[in-house]
Amino acid sequence: MNFEANYRDLQSKMSFKDGKNGGKKGLKNQININAVFLPFVSRNPERAKFKNGFKGVLGEFARLVLDKTWDDELSADEIVKKIISEERVDCSLENEKYLEKLIADYLFDDNNDLNILKPSLFLYLPRNENNEKKGEYEIALFIRDVFFNKKDDFEFDEKFKDFFKDFNSNHILIKLILKSIFELPEKEIPLKYDTISNGVVNLFKEDINFLLDKNETYLLNNMELIFAYYYFFYSSQCTLLIDKDFKGDFDGGIEPLYYALDWESISKNRKTIKQGFNLVYDANAYLFDKCCLLSQLNTYMGVEGKLLFELNDEFNEYGDEDKQECLKWLKKWIDDYQYVKDISTLSRNSRIDIPENVDNEFGDVVNLLSSTLYEGVDQAVRSRYSLNIREIAKLYFLKNRGVHGSILNLTQDMFLVITSLCIKEDKIKLNHLFGEYEKRGLFFDKYSKEKIVDLLNNLNLIDK
């Protein structure tokens, strides 16, 4: 392998300038280059705050799945006018205003949000009007790429496309609206994000496939909660896996995160306090640094979408000569970085644990690069990046419990939706049900389990 050429490519990708010949020295801490794992952004205005829930993401997602794009000129009034103006709608001028109001009242709620009467109307959920639309768009693209990658499961993707193409209805007004609805502009967007947690993806497909086959109405009515949960589930597991560095692997299963229930009280000894969102929070503290590290190493080693433990396997496949060349030019890159960032001393706080299966020299050089990034990344950028996962958690999965702080929490609505995905059509044995919860990332201590049993017994959902 030509590591010198890879080194030059890395310089280019990171906008490296050595400052010679009177120029200004510098480089950019770029992420999402050859290692694109999460849809997080580092600029506060662009970070999704979910003021309208997950609807903005679902609208973008539906359009991405069907290779459509939003028309920025559209508004609630424009949508109604476009429906009325279609040739299929034939009415006199005196009745036009009445029809406009009738359609508007049916299509939009009191907050002027679109009522999703049929799956095809997801396409017309508007973008956020401010810069947060970039953050929502990236999340939608991430969900499409990770969960609906047509290269991996063409049949599943086509089935979901058919779901969004449903323009049929027996209701006369809905039928009028759907027949008169206008086409959005076409735009195909290439894949961007890498998938690193196939176990979560496979569970998602299992659950969505069941609903597409057996209960599309339930999917339509609960799509916001289902997609928001799986986005948080995947993102948190992905973050925890990246944080394991060399110690990660794909065989370790789901990392346990304990939840409390919205309707129960909490004491200091509960598992969710010590093994809940605090783990995700800690892993996110230096996530930007780790994404920089992975982008640089993937680019330098001429690969894509690999985590640190996979890059170690890659290095171990090299012959002795390639290993030495790899280390030589990687050290050169670290020298470059330290030079343009004026880094003279390194903190030991950023050191990565090196297991026995990691080549000592490779581990030491990666550690040196990690420590260098620790000094070279702006703390404000690092902090803003760590807030991305907290935004979705605040909306659906966190509750302030006084002295215990914010802990992972499930509302009854969210809990019952995930329960329905676990149970499917038939009643289920209690032990099997808790196993299904844990497969989906929901872990409960004995106190929460007692509350769950009480609720499910009242709803007659489990076999005793």
Could you say what each language-model-derived stretch is?
Residues N457-K464:
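A short, conserved structural fragment
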Residues Q324-I407:
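Long, low-complexity, charged/polar intrinsically disordered regions in eukaryotic proteins
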Residues L442-L455:
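Short amphipathic alpha-helical interaction segments
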Residues D426-R440:
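Short acidic, hydrophobic short linear motifs in intrinsically disordered regions
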Residues K81-L257:
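Long, mid-chain structured domain cores
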Residues M1-D113:
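Charged, amphipathic alpha-helical stretches
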Residues N409-D426:
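Positively charged, polyanion-binding regions of nucleic-acid-associated proteins
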Residues D213-S347:
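Long, internal scaffold/assembly segments composed of regular secondary structure
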